[in-house]
């Protein structure tokens, strides 16, 4: 397919920073999203739902970069500015609730055109640092960065891991039998323990069944888990609008799949998933700790993995995070990379502090490793570490 000539008159650049303009470009945005096969995280509906419900709007600004050719939208660089820790960061729009980030590009749009758009976003200012994370190896933004005439941003040391289940099983039962004997036994023991409290049912929530009660239950369980961990998340606050709005986007796209595990009518585990491009993606999960002896989260996971394979899906993606259950069941993992760079002196100083802290930490870890490798008598006499007193 022919690319656009990289002349200014061939395309028009725009930076969207207002609610009104964000709403106006919805149809053109989603048309490009459907053509380009983007994930739901890059859809206009997802970004708009996030922007409408995200808390702390006073500390945020939109920076949605667009490339037009006439009335046709050819590329979208969905960015936003957020203030935290005294700095303004340029990052992906909806980064709070998106596991994978990327640019949307028509095949006819060149890397040079996107580079010009990036330069315009940087020139517009308003931020101290850019930090674009969760970049998949096969993502379009990665390809644009690495192109000879591409953006060429600096890689950052911060990475994340996504865990996935993929294989040549034709049925869920085959996948189950491929698990270790211990894993199969743990599943059966878990179900048996749950059945001591009543009938256990695994089910996919019908599309015509209201999701509200399940989402309320999910939020309650998440708040309890967060409190026990000493953390908070605005997404799960009672009455917070973001979670229902995002789930509604999944439902409207026909992608939503909510799985529940019920014990005598009580929901003991929940997984809010969605299907795209032949992959079942596990977006949000939780379980009731009062039923922990039966491992309801593990039972539900093994049930929906089997369901997914039976439906002909090629992969189950647990998305970001290195939780033990994800690593345990994954057959493959991908590393999500990031880029970072300064725009202001304040940003440069912040990066210098970060790099210095990292260098000091690496040096300390190397020193501890060297000491751990020494015989006990030699380690006791290392400089800076007094030898034990003799008695």
Question: Where are the model-predicted features located?
Answer:
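Active-site/acyl-donor-binding loops of N-acyltransferases
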Residues: 2-15, 19, 81, 142-174, ...
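A conserved beta-strand-loop-helix scaffold within acyl/acetyltransferase catalytic domains
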Residues: 12-91, 134-160, 168-293, 389-391
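Aromatic/His-enriched, Gly/Pro-containing loop or helix-boundary segments
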Residues: 47-54, 62, 101-114
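Short, high-confidence coil segments that cap the C-terminus of an alpha-helix
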Residues: 59-62, 125-127, 256, 311-313
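Aromatic (often tryptophan-rich) hydrophobic motifs at membrane interfaces
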Residues: 68, 76, 98, 106, ...
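Residues forming anionic-ligand binding surfaces in small-molecule and nucleic-acid pockets
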Residues: 91-97, 104
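ATP-hydrolysis module of ASCE/P-loop NTPase motor domains
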Residues: 122-140
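Short catalytic-loop micro-motif centered on adjacent basic/acidic residues
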Residues: 130-132, 203, 317
